[in-house]
Amino acid sequence: GIIEFRRLLIGNGVNMLGSSIFIIGMSWTVAQIGGPKIYGLIFTAYFLGHLPLLLYGGMVVDRMPRRTVALVADLSQAALVTLAIIALMAGMDEIKTLLVVTFLTGGAGAFSIPAIGALVPDLVEEDLLPQANAMRGVAMTAAWMFGPLIGGVTVGAWGIEVCLLLDVITFLFSG
């Protein structure tokens, strides 16, 4: 019911906060190293991982427990970003590492996004759906408003690895 919806709302808001921190950290890092062409390539990699799996992700969400799908997707993204941190700290190529992790997390997001969206009607009564969806929209907007600020300060002060670590923490929190 409402308590589960609140948990979903907070978890999803925190998850979006982490995603926006990641995007700003990655964007700044890529802009410094590779320039606008690489920046565009990184975003293309995300959607190449995401779009082909989105319909399949929706079918999986319709056939499996939605919470399980969301949890597995969030934990998968946390594991992928953790591997990226390890790779970057080991001195691996930043651009290639970010390309791979962005592609793979895009694929995992193709399961997470439909699962979270489908959970809302499961958790609130039909007459409360408009308010629930509005609250979810406010939480997402707030996350996308504050995340870039946090991401910019973080990447400027401590580098991309700390931005990625914050993203991992938010995936674990939301899961």
Locate each region found by the language model:
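Alpha-helical transmembrane-bundle signature of multi-pass membrane transport and export proteins
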Residues: G1-G175
